[in-house]
Amino acid sequence: PNGVVGSEMVAGQKVKQGTLQMAIVTAANAGSFSPCVNVLTFPYLFSGPEDIMGEKGYLRPGSAFREELTKRILADTGSMRLIAVGTNGFRLLFTKKPVTKMGDLKGIKLRLAASPVMQRTWETWGASAYAMAWSETFTAIQQGVMDAFECPTNILLYNGFYPYTNHVAENLYYCPQIFLILVNERWYQKLSPEQKSFLNEAAAINELEHFAWVQAEYDDVRKQLVNHGVEFHDINDVEQWKANAIALWPDFAEMSGGK
């Protein structure tokens, strides 16, 4: 149940220590355990959903990128194994007023996960970015402590944010919300070969089914949000956003254990 084992960061730490067998941690937060995960938050690394989990997707089960990510997470942490990956779609910007150009971000207080890559990206674009736990976000938006946040549209709908942030910058598509299912390595190694095979197979099937479901529901989610009074806008200078963000990649590579 929500909140029983604590926040993502707390749950991830418990998996690392072995006091919890499994946790779901978004890539934006998992970088604190394994720097290589920060690469999943690079702006404009993924050009669309198919790049993530499509037939040739970087994170599709069995891909070379996925295998390398699994190895590096285990090497970095010594105790955390990547068992599954998922995405709820690309992060879009949700605000109290329309944002159609970079200059509109001036003065906006933006809630972010504790990701140095994402924070640097948004500050480069001109927003005032603040790291905040997800559990605190709804109240902060509701009370006006924060003006905006970014997530996939299904989060805006299912978590009831739309009365407070009813404008969406729809064509931003700078970064997907990726989550990792991590298990404690010592616990995993105690499983029988049959149990490991079952777990790995179930995880792979679930990943692809979830990806297909998220893709299929996007239009319906958008329609429901429009019916709730949410307005969708395009950013007019989105190519400038992209250029400014990609220029930061060399700095981000260092944050991810690269060069």
Predicted segments, located by residue:
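N-terminal secretory/targeting leader peptides
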Residues: 1-51, 69, 73-259
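Signature of the catalytic double-stranded beta-helix
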Residues: 54-70
